[in-house]
């Protein structure tokens, strides 16, 4: 049996990447939220690594930022800094039509509150705000949530296998330090 080589595509903060068979999309998340899109009917998958929940309403200056597409090492990369723009980028980069949205499956990961004191009001916990907004944005976009692993104090690693269409979310335990 021939061994198939799998290419790992790491999605950094603020990026959106699209994967296809033979690739695994991964991200390491703390308070950031990872948004995974699954469209197995076309064997296309996407992952966004979002730093914050919402973008400002200010217009974007560059044409690359407007389309949500730039090139990095030959890989198409979109605008994933904010949850709202990341969802737009994923839909655009995966060429998802309105009538196809119900076929899409979405997973969410991250949104941990890793470095805030325990007495911080919930409205100021970046991870909690990101997680809550991501859930609302997915629902508002008419997308179907397959699963999530959000909140708490631990970071996470999300992987999307573009061969099998399976995903894995692993919690990353905290080592030392105080909260």
UniProtKB/Swiss-Prot annotation:
Source species, domain of life: Bacteria
Keywords, in A-Z order: Chemotaxis, Hydrolase, Plasmid
Molecular function GO terms recorded: protein-glutamine glutaminase activity
The protein's name: Probable chemoreceptor glutamine deamidase CheD 2
Positions of transmembrane segments: none
Keyword check for Hydrolase: yes
GN (gene name): cheD2
Pfam families according to UniProt: CheD
Function field: Probably deamidates glutamine residues to glutamate on methyl-accepting chemotaxis receptors (MCPs), playing an important role in chemotaxis.
Gene3D superfamilies in the record: 3.30.1330.200
Biological processes per GO annotation: chemotaxis
Cross-referenced CDD domains: CheD
Reactions listed under catalytic activity: L-glutaminyl-[protein] + H2O = L-glutamyl-[protein] + NH4(+)
Cystine crosslinks: none
UniProt keyword Hydrolase present: yes
